[in-house]
Structures are given as structure tokens and as C-alpha cells.
Amino acid sequence: GSNGEPGSAGPPGPAGLRGLPGESGAVGPAGPPGSR
């Protein structure tokens, strides 16, 4: 973006691995900030 303007945050990480049947994993962490 413009000088001094932080980039937008990255997209959420992929879903975590599934645990027991029918149990979805936790969502991954957000991506790193975008470039300035």
C-alpha cells in the first residue's frame, strides 16, 4: 500500500487434521501481515 500503511493480514490457515470420526480439527493461525 502507501508508505507507512501496513498490509492486510493473510488468510486463515487450513483446517486442522481431523481427530475422532466426525470431529473437525481446529482452524490454523492467521497468515502473516501483507507487505507494506
From Swiss-Prot:
Proline residues at the third position of the tripeptide repeating unit (G-X-Y) are hydroxylated in some or all of the chains. These protein fragments were extracted from an 80-million-year-old fossil. The tryptic peptides required multiple purification steps in order to eliminate contaminants and to increase the concentration of peptidic material. GO terms for cellular component: collagen trimer; extracellular region. Keywords: Collagen, Extinct organism protein, Extracellular matrix, Hydroxylation, Repeat, Secreted. The lineage of its organism: Eukaryota, Metazoa, Chordata, Craniata, Vertebrata. Residues 1-36 are annotated as: Disordered. Belongs to the fibrillar collagen family. It is found in: Secreted, Extracellular space, Extracellular matrix. This is Collagen alpha-2(I) chain. Coiled coil: none annotated. Residues 15-29 have a biased composition (Low complexity). The gene is COL1A2. The keyword rRNA-binding does not apply. Trimers of one alpha 2(I) and two alpha 1(I) chains. Its main location: secreted. The modification 4-hydroxyproline is found at residues 6, 12, 33. It comes from the Eukaryota. Type I collagen is a member of group I collagen (fibrillar forming collagen).
